Curated annotation (Swiss-Prot):
The gene is SQE3. Keywords: FAD, Flavoprotein, Membrane, Oxidoreductase, Transmembrane, Transmembrane helix. It is a multi-pass membrane protein. GO terms for cellular component: membrane. Its main location: membrane. The keyword Oxidoreductase applies. InterPro entries: FAD/NAD-bd_sf, Squalene_epoxidase, Squalene_monox. This is Squalene epoxidase 3. GO terms for molecular function: flavin adenine dinucleotide binding; squalene monooxygenase activity. Pfam families: NAD_binding_8, SE. It is found in: Membrane. It catalyses: squalene + reduced [NADPH--hemoprotein reductase] + O2 = (S)-2,3-epoxysqualene + oxidized [NADPH--hemoprotein reductase] + H2O + H(+). It comes from the Eukaryota.
Length: 525
């Protein structure tokens, strides 16, 4: 009997020790799998490497928005992993003019030195040309330091400077790779799956993923309801060694059928962008585009730079790019948000894209600042919702102005639209508040929705008033009524797409009143 009891006791003791050992081994392995960077799984022959939890924020894309955001959040102490498809210097024909309002945001983010040593040019306003007449519109900069002005430059040089500055921060990791998808679990974005430069499939995880992979984003569909429109295309040229009629000014020619833009991008180069309405373009390869530019566009170019324009066409370096517009319509997704052109686009006529992006980054930085720990998904989601609301007044004003101004500047066979175009040019030529007000909107110095609407309809009323002086007629009254109707038909659909309540009455939306989190609410749950 005694030996049997002894054997049972030994079995129980051995079982207990083995169970304890197995439990400890399992615990160590689970801890190791969570903390070791680069644990490997092989599925269907594809190598997937899952990164550890040493990242606070993943940024997809390192263009203007992504690079500026990486530096901003890195400077705030966040551990940032940036994944960019191509880290070589970009070569684009847009994103070359930063409005004064955007430059102020650049200063606020501590990135103003990124426009130094790249041969950037100061921009002090615009010159408008129409039917042989011209008017100069200066930015209202009297209340600002002498350094504050617009800046124009090679986009790639500017982006590279910001990338370099972000990369200098020890907590920012810049990696070349192509993000193929967002990693989602139970409706929450956990990170991204991407291919490295060498073709290796990797996954990276973080509490927050910010997608800013540009106008051709392949990730936006899961984070917003994209309604992309392409009203026109830009045809880009570089004019060399020529002087613009008004130095340090952007030049807008109200041509037929659409605007032509000129602005300096270095001390010896001038960018020309010819807007071509619709989706169909003359062929560049066949020479049809060059013929179109020489015969249809060149006669409308100011005489001082016409020879340089023709010379640029003959050199043959003609590039095109679709002009996209897309109102912001986010899908609130825990763990992720959109930024930059991936989220919101407007016609580039007014050069407002970088101003919107930099303004968004300032808002996002200030919202995330009190959140010590981003792993609290509920708290983080509330602040992302606040971001989408707080950005609306500024972004929507710039977006609406770009869309409305482009439609007004288009030539049209309709008498009412043509009268609106003439009224706009003459209204801006009046000077005083009639020019400083709209230019303050355009420059991002006073992006107020109500001011935009007031000036837009002031142009329409100015046009109607001219029709009724000295004596009104039935024909002129009818034309005036159609002019008001045309103006309404231009601006109201844009405002509706942007969101009337968010644009004009944001304070009626609870998300705008988001108090800083208490220490307990910002700690992980």
């Amino acid at each position: 009997m005694a030996p049997t009891i002894f054997v049972d006791h030994c079995i129980l003791t051995t079982t207990f020790v083995a169970s304890l050992f197995a439990f400890l081994l399992l615990y160590v392995l689970r801890r190791r799998s969570k903390t070791i960077h680069g644990s490997v799984n092989v599925r269907n022959g594809t190598l997937t490497v899952k990164s550890g939890t040493d990242v606070d924020i993943i940024i997809v894309g390192a263009g203007v928005a992504g690079a500026a955001l990486a530096h901003t959040l890195g400077k705030e102490g966040r551990r940032v992993h940036v994944i960019e498809r191509d880290l070589t210097e970009p070569d684009r024909i847009v994103g070359e003019l930063l409005q004064p309002g955007g430059y102020l945001k650049l200063i606020e983010l501590g990135l103003e030195d990124c426009v130094k040593d790249i041969d950037a040019q100061r921009v002090l306003g615009y010159a408008l040309f129409k039917d042989g007449k011209h008017t100069k519109l200066s930015y209202p900069l009297d209340q600002f330091d002498s350094d504050v002005a617009g800046r124009s430059f090679h986009n790639g040089r500017f982006v590279q400077r910001m990338r370099e500055k972000a990369s200098l921060l020890p907590n920012v990791r810049m990696e070349q790779g192509t993000v193929t998808s967002l990693v989602e679990e139970n409706g929450i974005i956990k990170g991204v799956q991407y291919k490295t430069k060498d073709g290796q499939e990797l996954k990276s995880f973080a509490p927050l993923t910010i997608v800013c992979d540009g106008c051709f984003s392949n990730l936006r569909r899961s984070l917003c309801k994209p309604k992309v429109e392409v009203p026109s295309n830009f045809v880009g040229l570089v004019l060399e060694n020529c002087e613009l009629p008004f130095p340090n000014h952007g030049h807008v020619v109200l041509g037929d059928p659409s605007p032509i833009l000129f602005y300096p991008i270095s001390s010896s180069e001038v960018r020309c962008l010819v807007d071509v309405p619709g989706s169909k373009l003359p062929s560049v390869a066949s020479g049809e585009m060059a013929h179109h530019l020489k015969t249809m566009v060149a006669p409308q170019v100011p005489p001082q730079i016409r020879d340089a324009f023709i010379s640029a066409v003959e050199k043959g370096n003609i590039r095109t790019m679709p002009n996209r517009s897309m109102p912001a319509d986010p899908i609130h997704t825990p763990g992720a948000l959109l930024l930059g052109d991936a989220f919101n686009m407007r016609h580039p006529l007014t050069g407002g894209g970088m101003t919107v992006a930099l303004s968004d980054i300032v808002i996002l930085r200030d919202l995330l600042n009190p959140l010590v720990d981003l792993t609290n998904k509920e708290s983080l989601s509330k602040y992302i919702e606040s971001f989408y609301t707080l950005r609306k007044p500024v972004a929507s004003t710039i977006n609406t102005l770009a869309g409305a101004l482009y439609k007004v500047f288009l030539a049209s066979p309709d008498d009412a639209r043509s009268e609106m175009r003439r009224a706009c040019f003459d209204y801006l030529s009046l000077g005083g508040v009639c020019s400083s007000g709209p230019v303050a909107l355009l420059s991002g110095l006073n992006p107020r929705p109500m001011s935009l609407v007031l000036h837009f309809f002031a142009v329409a009323i100015f046009g109607v008033g001219r029709l009724l002086v000295p004596l009104p007629s039935v024909k002129r009254l009818w034309l005036g009524a159609r002019l008001i109707s045309s103006a309404s038909g231009i601006i109201f659909p844009i405002i509706k797409a942007e969101g009337v309540r968010q644009m004009f009455f944001p304070r009626t939306i609870p998300a705008i009143y988001r108090a800083p989190p208490t220490p307990s609410s910002s700690s992980p749950q």
